[in-house]
A protein has these predicted regions:
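Short, intrinsically disordered terminal tails adjacent to the first/last structured region
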Residues: 2-4, 114
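Accessible peptide chain termini
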Residues: 1-2, 234
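Formylglycine-dependent sulfatase
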Residues: 27-28, 35, 41-234
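Sec-dependent signal peptide recognition
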Residues: 4-11, 24-33
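Short, intrinsically disordered, low-complexity terminal segments
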Residues: 8, 39-40
Length: 234
């Protein structure tokens, strides 16, 4: 029996937050609204396009929007300036697999069996919100890292829980450790494949900054070690 995606305010378990800026309803606010309010008024006829972007193994202070002078994130800053900027947010797990499974199912890791453990499997019984969007008429897909690491096939799923994969386009990375997946070109392929003005939902799972450490990479990036802010717990 399918475990339904929860139709409550807990449908977005990735954060318990206060936010400092809320202006135009851009991509982030659209996503939050879509996840928190899956049952919309019948009077609403238009369906907003949704672009979900998630980095891998990144702590919240490491963005210039949060005041970091070492890490420059102009794209993230633009979203923060025109949407919502959270300053008290929490993930449900420090591991990739369970954290992403929580996002996809709207449930805590302890509620989703194997999907709540790292690098395991993803039981087919649990509904994922991309599938619900597809049922509602959306064209869905993902590039980069979707749900993982783990084996989603073993439970009988026909595709990654994040949606159909768009990872064919590749590039020559500028630095060692940077993914060779061409996120933007894969997104263009996705848009080309949809029918007309069909509403879309697309997951961009950047593998960065979770990558092997490269000796003296800070010198190549013209950074100074003395500018690194070490967390107090280290």
């Amino acid at each position: 029996m399918k475990r339904k995606f929860p139709k409550t305010l807990f449908a977005l378990p990735i954060c318990s937050s206060t936010f400092t800026r809320m202006s135009n309803k851009h991509i982030l606010s659209t996503l939050v609204s879509s996840l928190l309010i899956p049952q919309v008024s019948a009077a609403v006829t238009s369906k907003p396009n949704i672009l979900f972007v998630i980095s891998d193994d990144q702590s919240y202070p490491h963005a210039s929007a949060y005041g970091s002078s070492l890490v420059k994130t102009p794209g993230f800053d633009l979203v923060a300036q025109n949407g919502w900027l959270f300053n008290n947010a929490f993930v449900t797990s420090p591991g990739s697999s369970p954290s992403r499974a929580s996002i996809l199912t709207g449930l805590y890791p302890w509620q989703i069996e194997e999907a709540g453990t790292h690098a395991s499997s993803f039981p087919i019984d649990y509904e994922c919100f991309p599938d619900l969007l597809e049922e509602a008429g959306y064209y869905i897909g993902y590039t980069g890292k979707g749900w993982g690491p783990g084996n989603w096939k073993i439970s009988g799923r026909r595709r990654n829980p994040a949606g159909p994969e768009y990872n064919k386009r590749r590039i020559r990375p500028p630095y060692k450790g940077i993914s060779n997946i061409n996120y933007s070109q894969n997104f263009k392929d996705f848009l080309h494949d949809r029918e007309g003005k069909q509403p879309f939902y697309f997951w961009v799972g950047a593998n960065e900054p979770h990558r092997p450490y490269e000796k003296d990479s800070w010198e190549k990036a013209d950074k100074r070690l003395v500018d690194v802010e070490v967390p107090p717990f280290l």
